[in-house]
């Protein structure tokens, strides 16, 4: 079987091994990619995972407290401890924590949202559109647009970044990955607000945080 340059490139991206080692492994494996990975690992020439598939198990846990009324804990992972100590990475994690305090997302990404919740929201939005007298043939498209808006309201990576609303938190994350040169992942977060779930006088603490961020 002919070993193409694209096959060698793919194996190199998966394993981090040298080009010639990748070509030899593919030749030995008769073009079977999985077997070629095994060959390289047997020879100690392959990392377990690379690039976006690389394991990001280092990183930081950042906390932010706003006036004793809003508290956030967020975990952001990097591949190496070296990057976790990098000031740009630290600043990014801090900005993410402040953004969560200000924008109150419920999930990191849309894949984390319970499908049952999405279906329920679609059902409600469909009924709303029909009650508004919209033709059935355009209701589906309208609901799709409103579901996208729904995701942008509750998913961290899709929210406009508080310090620069022209970019999303996801855009900012992609920019940092490119600049730092390592896979970075916002893994999880928790946000607390005083009196959450208790009926009380309306106070917009999140707006206060957003104003504070804009001043920094």
From Swiss-Prot:
The lineage of its organism: Bacteria, Bacillati, Bacillota, Clostridia, Peptostreptococcales. Residues 80-83 are annotated as: Involved in Mg(2+) ion dislocation from EF-Tu. Belongs to the EF-Ts family. It comes from the Bacteria. Associates with the EF-Tu.GDP complex and induces the exchange of GDP to GTP. It remains bound to the aminoacyl-tRNA.EF-Tu.GTP complex up to the GTP hydrolysis stage on the ribosome. This is Elongation factor Ts. It is found in: Cytoplasm. The keyword Cytoplasm applies. InterPro entries: EF-Ts_dimer_sf, Transl_elong_EFTs/EF1B, Transl_elong_EFTs/EF1B_dimer, Transl_elong_Ts_CS, UBA-like_sf. GO terms for molecular function: translation elongation factor activity. Pfam families: EF_TS. Disulfide bonds: none annotated. Coiled coil: none annotated. The gene is tsf. One of its GO terms (cellular component) is cytoplasm. Keywords: Cytoplasm, Elongation factor, Protein biosynthesis. CDD domains: UBA_EF-Ts.
